Amino acid sequence: MAAKEIIFHDGARTKLVEGVNLLANAVKVTLGPKGRNVVLERSFGSPVVTKDGVSVAKEIELADKVQNIGAQLVKEVASKTSDAAGDGTTTATVLAQAIVREGQKYVAAGLNPLDLKRGIDKAVAAAVEELKKISKPTTTSKEIAQVATISANGEESIGQRIAEAIDRVGKEGVITVEDGKSLADELDVVEGLQFDRGYLSPYFINNPDRQLAVLDEPFILLHDKKISNIRDLLPVLEQVAKAGRPLLIVAEDVEGEALATLVVNNIRGTLKTVAVKAPGFGDRRKALLEDIAILTGGQVIAEETGLTLEKATLQELGRAKRIEVGKENTTLIDGAGDKPNIDARVKQIRAQIADATSDYDREKLQERVAKLAGGVAVIKVGGATEVEVKEKKDRVDDALHATRAAVEEGIVPGGGVALIRVKQAIAELTGANVDQKAGINIVLRALEEPLRQIVANAGEEASVVVATVAAGSGNYGYNAATGEYGDLVESGVLDPTKVTRTALQNAASIAGLLLTTDATVHEAPKDAPPAQPAGVPGAGGTGFDF
């Protein structure tokens, strides 16, 4: 085990605070509509230019071990806020730095750190309750666009794209972000259920212009095993042929004789069919097949349900208005499933989401809900260079998360004003002793910091703006983008309540832990290896090393 070094008391805290300040100073230059960019070096590929606070924080590793501990603790604030709310990482970092800075003064003056922390916690709890009171729900597409625009650092086109996507697929719908292939941003909306499996043979294509196999009013056969013997399929094929409608086969795999026969019949025009592999793997595959069955009003042909291919009838087959099968995706449009059954399935999956322990499982379950309840929208981010697309994509992701947070818990006036407005509720608090009251005062001062930083980044005098905003009430605040005072909600400067709340709670949590720290234990620096000799005596000054 490597030797450890221990630092105590003020020496430890001072180094930790230095680390906090180094990271926070790099992150906070990005805050607000006039925030600056940060360039991140990459060990390979182009440098990354970003205004995303958490992206900057994640890149920072300091050479000094103790400073690095402080920096990593604040990095945790940014990461946790990003995970919970998807945005507000820079605000959280600025708040954490302010609480640590103010708290350090009181600790150095001899106040009890534990009582300071109790005062901080009391003030934050009161601030959160007040935020909930001043929050109002998002009801219009315009408000959603405004929230997204603010989170995307004032880029209106991103806000409009996200609002349009939510309009099209609903609040439950899946919205994904991809690299575009043009200079402009694009929005693609897939209505109906889409899964990531394409045709098993290009001979199924009947729309060469779009390279798709398109089936109108088809039957849908769902099977959880491989199909290789055509004799298993013949009874179903004969019934479908008599009905005079096309057939989509979704199975674990279709191969050999069975696939060859389907292709030949398709080419001859005897029976229009398309075969695709079932999406997913293992238990997830079974669940997805069941989703498709419920959406199309069919049943999965599986041994577990006592159904076999040989005895399958048209009653067990699903139906849809139209199906489009590409090389990589299959889209089912307007399935014939009963709405009560679909709603019951959605409710069941939502219950599984509540019980899910891993983020991956939760994400996949939410995707299934969206596919059943709404649809899928894809925002394709355009740009002139790879660096520009990457930077813009980060902002679109932030804006998307902020929008979801706004839908969830509502909105408050942005630009740091909401935190100024909750000060009144905190100012009325009393602590159990002088030290706790000092903790409350720490939060009162820290709540001004996001507004101060937004104003400083805009090149204005922070103290004057803070005093003017504090003298106002309600939504009155400073719009840093225009340099004017007014009603921020009317002018579209909004923040999701969840983002502001999460940023404050996470900042106070980590800052409180830092203030109550009295020792650090870290790996001792290794001694430098002895220098190599410049050459070998008698080698004529050749400088060769051996």
From Swiss-Prot:
CDD domains: GroEL. PROSITE patterns: CHAPERONINS_CPN60 (PS00296). Gene3D superfamilies: GroEL (3.50.7.10), GroEL-like equatorial domain (1.10.560.10), TCP-1-like chaperonin intermediate domain (3.30.260.10). Pfam families: Cpn60_TCP1. It comes from the Bacteria. Keywords: ATP-binding, Chaperone, Cytoplasm, Isomerase, Nucleotide-binding. It is an enzyme of class 5 (isomerase). GO terms for molecular function: ATP binding; ATP-dependent protein folding chaperone; isomerase activity; unfolded protein binding. Residues 524-546 are annotated as: Disordered. InterPro entries: Chaperonin_Cpn60_CS, Cpn60/GroEL, Cpn60/GroEL/TCP-1, GroEL-like_apical_dom_sf, GROEL-like_equatorial_sf, TCP-1-like_intermed_sf. GO terms for cellular component: cytoplasm. It catalyses: ATP + H2O + a folded polypeptide = ADP + phosphate + an unfolded polypeptide. It is found in: Cytoplasm. ATP binds at residues 30-33, 51, 87-91, 415, 479-481, 495. Residues 537-546 have a biased composition (Gly residues). Its main location: cytoplasm. One of its GO terms (biological process) is protein refolding. The keyword Ribosomal protein does not apply. The keyword Transmembrane does not apply. Forms a cylinder of 14 subunits composed of two heptameric rings stacked back-to-back. Interacts with the co-chaperonin GroES. Belongs to the chaperonin (HSP60) family. Together with its co-chaperonin GroES, plays an essential role in assisting protein folding. The GroEL-GroES system forms a nano-cage that allows encapsulation of the non-native substrate proteins and provides a physical environment optimized to promote and accelerate protein folding. This is Chaperonin GroEL 2. It comes from Burkholderia thailandensis (strain ATCC 700388 / DSM 13276 / CCUG 48851 / CIP 106301 / E264). The lineage of its organism: Bacteria, Pseudomonadati, Pseudomonadota, Betaproteobacteria, Burkholderiales.
